[in-house]
Amino acid sequence: KDGYAELLADPEIEAVIIAVPLHLHAQVAIDAMLAGKHVLTEKLMAKTVAECKLMGRIAKEKNLYLATGHQRHYSVLYDNAVNLIKWGALGELHHIRAQWHRGNLPGRDSWQMPLPGGEIPIGGEEKDRFDKIANGIKSLERQVKAEKDPVAKQMLEGKLAQYIAWDSDKNGGQERALQHGFQDFELPAGHSRSALEELCRWRLWERTGGGLMAELGSHQMDAAGIFCSAL
């Protein structure tokens, strides 16, 4: 209930990982560094360039590590490509083409997460409510019951526990989202978006996310930067 203040006050903790919605990265990272903690943020580093610069200045002033978890920096494939460039094996670098084929289908990625308690389609009625989380719990319960392998069963039980905890946010989740600064909003088409939906689907909203270029395009820009820095 006290947020992360107690965590940052713990002298036994040396570093933190920032895994909150993008618009909160800067504030949490700055608070952590002011408390003397090293920081690893998920990408992007922050929502605005100004926030990134401020984070960098504080890290330098406090002599702390501040890193961003762009996955390409931890890939042996990209590390090998960097070495090939440094060795001159690829010749002179004139052009970089970066692409990543995810094959995402609408509604089947991590951007439009299911809402605790389910949701009614736009234009639908209560009888049309679809609860993907509750359905997932039922499916996992069946899988746990049928699984014979102890290791596989334990993994399924862990996933089931996550779904049950996720589902519990249907009770009080909206109020807690409002308390943490997320907002209700009326969309132009007449659809009412709750604070809980803004929290669960923060990548979809301009106030909380950075859009396609931030979430996906940044990987390709980062790849180009990695290779250019090898020159």
What do these predicted ranges mean?
Residues 1-35, 50-65, 115-174:
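N-terminal glycine-/serine-/threonine-rich beta1-alpha1-beta2 phosphate-ribose binding loop
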Residues 35-48:
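ADP-ribose/adenylate-binding Rossmann-like module
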Residues 43-45, 69-72, 100:
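Short strand-turn motif at the edge of the Rossmann-like AdoMet-binding core
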Residues 54-72, 81, 90-96:
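Rossmann-fold dehydrogenase core element
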Residues 68-70, 203-214:
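Active-site rim elements
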Residues 75-97, 110-114, 159, 166, ...:
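Oxidoreductase and adenylate-handling cofactor-binding alpha/beta cores
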Residues 77-142:
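Rossmann-like NAD(P)H-binding beta-loop-alpha module
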Residues 189-203:
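Active-site-adjacent bridging/hinge elements
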